[in-house]
């Protein structure tokens, strides 16, 4: 327990909040070849590998993911939500934050219906998250 005098000399420091998606908080200046801190809600990237991953216990599935090189030259793993996708190796994708709890090392989601990523076909409910247009009557 510190004394009042110790607290006057050096007050308590508040805990600093660590970012859940650190790759979206850096910006690369290619002219100066330096990183700068600049928060962004999404970033554009190019797929370098598309594959499947098995989740942690007790779940069992083949979750689709893509390894993406972002526009700031950082490589990340991003989850591909929804049933079926059209992504290949050089597809350009939009990446947002948001982890997948049962996939270790996957802290980002790919935005469906943006850039080269198509929306989920035949989806009728919860279409907004999956980039699906309103079906014709």
Swiss-Prot record:
Molecular function GO terms recorded: rRNA binding; structural constituent of ribosome; tRNA binding
Name this polypeptide is given: Small ribosomal subunit protein uS12
Keywords, alphabetical: Methylation, Ribonucleoprotein, Ribosomal protein, RNA-binding, rRNA-binding, tRNA-binding
Region called Disordered, residue ranges: 1-55, 118-137
NCBIfam families in UniProt: rpsL_bact
Cellular component, GO, one term: small ribosomal subunit
Gene Ontology terms: biological process: translation
Modified residues (3-methylthioaspartic acid): 102
Disulphide bond pairs: none
Pfam family, one: Ribosom_S12_S23
InterPro entries from the UniProt entry: NA-bd_OB-fold, Ribosomal_uS12, Ribosomal_uS12_bac
Assembly with partners or alone: Part of the 30S ribosomal subunit. Contacts proteins S8 and S17. May interact with IF1 in the 30S initiation complex.
Name of the gene encoding the protein in the UniProt record: rpsL
Family recorded in the similarity comment: Belongs to the universal ribosomal protein uS12 family.
């Amino acid at each position: 327990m510190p004394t009042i005098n110790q607290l006057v000399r050096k007050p308590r420091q508040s805990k600093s909040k660590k970012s859940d998606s650190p790759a979206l908080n850096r910006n690369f200046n290619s002219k100066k070849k330096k990183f700068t801190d600049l928060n962004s809600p999404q970033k554009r990237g190019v797929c370098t590998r598309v594959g499947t991953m098995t989740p942690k216990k007790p779940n069992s599935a083949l979750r689709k993911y893509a390894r993406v090189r972002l526009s700031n030259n950082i490589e990340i793993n991003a989850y591909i939500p929804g049933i079926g996708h059209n992504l290949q190796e050089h597809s350009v994708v939009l990446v947002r934050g948001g982890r997948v709890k049962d996939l270790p090392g996957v802290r980002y989601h790919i935005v469906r219906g943006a850039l080269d990523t198509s929306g989920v076909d035949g989806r009728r409910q919860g279409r907004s998250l999956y980039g699906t247009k309103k079906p014709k009557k």
